[in-house]
C-alpha cells in the first residue's frame, strides 16, 4: 500500500515505451516520486528494462 503523500510531492509510475512496440510479453514499470511544482510536465527517464536487457526510455503514465 502506498502511503498518503502531502504537499507537492506525488508518486508516479514510469512505463517502458520500447517494450510495448516490441510485442514481447510482460511489462517494465518503475515507481518514483516527483515534485509537482518543479516538474509540471510528464517525466521521461532512461531506465533498465530487465526483459529487453538494456536501457530504454520510460515515460510517466496517468
Curated annotation (Swiss-Prot):
> Which Cys residues form disulphide pairs?
none
GO (cellular component) term, any one: ribonucleoprotein complex
Carries keyword Ribonucleoprotein? yes
Ribonucleoprotein listed as a keyword: yes
Q: Which molecular-function annotations from GO does this UniProt entry contain?
A: structural constituent of ribosome
Gene3D superfamilies annotated for this entry? Ribosomal protein L33 (2.20.28.120)
* Annotated keywords: Ribonucleoprotein, Ribosomal protein
Q: What's an example GO BP annotation here?
A: translation
Q: Which family does it belong to?
A: Belongs to the bacterial ribosomal protein bL33 family.
Alphabetical list of PANTHER family matching this protein: 50S RIBOSOMAL PROTEIN L33, CHLOROPLASTIC, LARGE RIBOSOMAL SUBUNIT PROTEIN BL33C
List the HAMAP family. Ribosomal_bL33 (MF_00294)
Q: Which NCBIfam families match?
A: PRK00504.1 (NF001764), PRK00595.1 (NF001860), rpmG_bact (TIGR01023)
Protein name per its UniProtKB record: Large ribosomal subunit protein bL33
**Organism encoding this protein:** Porphyromonas gingivalis (strain ATCC BAA-308 / W83)
